[in-house]
Amino acid sequence: MAISATQVKDLREKTGAGIMDCKRALEDAGGDVNQAIAILKQQGLSKAEKKSGRAATDGLVEPYIHAGGRIGALVEVNCETDFVGRTSEFRTLAHDVAMQVAASSPKYVSEDQIPEDAWDGLIQEYGDRAKAIQAVCLLDQVFIKDGRRTIRDLVNDNIGKVGENIVVRRFARFELGADLPPAADEVTE
């Protein structure tokens, strides 16, 4: 089946993938755009797996201050080169991750950062291990802008687009007065 330039352009706009990748995916899918998107997503995941071992030492620290200035977040997102770190796609990813941190209050970047002695309390609070991971691990949280994807999916999609490893290294979340004891007049009996 002959794939038109319009089909390739449309798929590219939807996925951000390269021209030849879009053309190959459309050819493999017999012109079916939805199947081509699935193929590109799978390729993106395999690219992410291949690149995960590469050092990501460049990148940026992205701030996000929620309207009203009462909640804010800082995230460090790393990539392999300063070229990628300056792209609008990378900056958008970092901004979205910072917004996620401000909105969802994760405690850890990923499951491997959870201390062993914290598991009992987390399982008691959330009911089971999987729910606890989704609640407290940034990469496993459902993306606030798209409830069908996690932050890990968002990062992996960007790895596939830019062709470099991307790592969410760390974050800090600030909420005005969150760590202060209640004032004497706020204490109820």
What are these regions (language model features)?
Residues 2-189:
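N-terminal assembly/interaction segments in proteins that build large macromolecular machines
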